[in-house]
Regions:
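Bacterial Sec-dependent N-terminal signal peptides
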Residues: 1-30
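Membrane-proximal, proline-rich intrinsically disordered regions
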Residues: 19-70, 74-85, 89, 93, ...
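Specific register positions within alpha-helical solenoid repeats of the TPR/Sel1-like families, i.e.
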Residues: 48, 86, 119, 123-126, ...
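Conserved, well-structured interaction surfaces
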Residues: 64-175, 331-336
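Internal, well-ordered domain-core segments that constitute the primary functional module
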Residues: 155-238
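Hydrophobic-face positions in mid-chain alpha helices that act as interaction patches
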Residues: 214-348, 353-354, 358-414
Length: 414
């Protein structure tokens, strides 16, 4: 009996020791449960600042010639809430780890990225989960309610204001944002981006007087006095490098079925916009005829409203322009942008036209165009010769482009 009791106790002791050892052994050092926020931020930045090609169909820039594309024809399609369990989840983890380590410098970026993603979600879907979203792990809230679009927009504006305040404090303290692959740890530049993006959101709401407790026009006027992007050096952009995993997204892409859209080509040719030479290649027919790259008649696009087979016939006949091959042959390509100085200048020009702020709308408008030309001049390699400052001046003097104070408000905005 004593022997049995001793054996039982020995087995229990061994079991307890085994459980303890089992737990220790199964702590995977290659799958940590806690990390520094500086290791999360690069992925958060890359996800937000990268750009795909889907919108090029809806924006009538390209057509597909080897199959049917729903976006090209504005067909109903299934949307995805994957932003919640991908990008927004990583933003939430950034906040959690920053709180754990006591690094308040990430607070402003947390609110900015949340605002950015919820802004895009509500534009796409309307009413979406917002106030109760992303609280499954922290609060056990796995069925968040849907908030109205107005509530989401008000929340976005609130969070952007918080982001600006937090980044202003970080900048004044000269705090460094470790892991920042956009602005090299410069909180002041992040604040400029945030404030510029606030103006973009407010202009999106131009047909509203108030959203929540936000007076659209008054708030725009106030933010316009805060630090904003002052040149292309402040662009919110992701610069690529020739390194595995960090190359331009379209490098070595297979584009055999993608060609230029007639809508896009015709608009640029009408305005004699030399940026067309950077986007597209002359048709094979035009090239065989010896037409120059700078000849706007050398370019043609496919009709985005017809069955893809009709555009495929144009490909065979050499009567449709390809996307410029520079996009898939350069490993660093050009930066992808969340928002840039050129866009901000157009926003300010429209605000002046609407009477929201004082200023010279013509100057803002021309600043934006020149900034766009300068940006492409920096990143377009051999094509930079087509987008010089002189080329921008010539473009701005064109009948379809030059500023005309005699136009109506709606015509100027268009």
């Amino acid at each position: 009996m004593k022997a049995k009791l001793f054996l039982s106790l020995a087995l229990m002791g061994a079991l307890c020791c085994s459980c303890s050892s089992f737990d220790d052994i199964n702590d995977n050092p290659n799958d940590p449960t806690a990390v520094s926020p500086k290791l999360i931020l690069p992925n958060v930045c890359e996800s937000a600042f990268s750009r795909g090609t889907g919108g090029m169909y809806a924006d009538k820039m390209v057509v597909q010639t080897d199959g049917h594309n729903a976006e090209q024809f504005y067909e109903w399609n299934r949307g995805s809430f994957s932003t919640y369990n991908n990008e927004l989840l990583q933003v939430t983890k950034l906040k959690e780890e920053a709180d754990r380590t006591g690094e308040t410098v990430y607070e402003g970026l947390y609110h900015f990225f949340r605002a950015y993603y919820f802004y895009n979600l509500t534009l796409k879907f309307g009413d979406v989960p917002y106030s109760e979203a992303l609280k499954g792990e922290s609060d056990g809230q796995f069925t968040p309610k849907y908030d109205s679009q107005e509530t989401v927009f008000a929340g976005v504006l609130d969070e952007l204001a918080t982001a600006s305040d937090e980044l202003s404090q970080s900048a004044s303290k000269q705090e460094s944002i470790s892991g920042d692959i956009i602005y090299g740890s410069d909180a002041a530049k992040w604040q400029k981006l945030v404030n510029s993006f606030r103006l973009k959101v407010l202009l999106t709401l131009s047909h509203k007087e108030k959203v929540g407790n936000h007076d659209i026009k008054q708030e725009f006027k106030q933010i316009a006095q805060l630090p904003l992007m002052a040149s292309n050096a402040d662009n919110g952009q992701l610069v690529y490098i020739d390194q595995e995993g960090n190359r331009y997204p379209q490098f070595n892409a297979q584009w055999s079925g993608f060609y230029m859209d007639k809508t896009f080509i015709d608009r640029m040719a009408l305005r004699k916009d030399p940026r067309l030479f950077l986007y597209a290649l002359p048709t094979n027919e035009a090239a065989s005829a010896g037409k120059a790259v700078t000849d706007f008649t050398a370019y043609a696009g496919g009709d985005p409203t017809v069955p893809y087979g009709e555009n495929k016939n144009l490909v065979g006949a050499g009567k449709i322009s390809q996307i410029n091959s520079r996009y898939r042959t350069n490993p660093t390509g050009e930066p992808t942008m969340l928002m840039g100085y050129a866009e901000l200048q157009q926003i300010l020009a429209e605000a002046v036209v609407r009477g929201w702020i004082q200023g010279d709308a013509k100057q803002y408008y021309e600043n934006g165009v020149r900034a766009s030309f300068a940006w492409y001049h920096t990143y377009s390699g051999d094509y930079a010769k087509y987008v010089t400052d002189d080329a921008a001046t010539t473009y701005l003097q064109g009948d379809e482009v030059k500023w005309d104070n005699q136009l109506t408000q709606e015509q100027k905005i268009e």
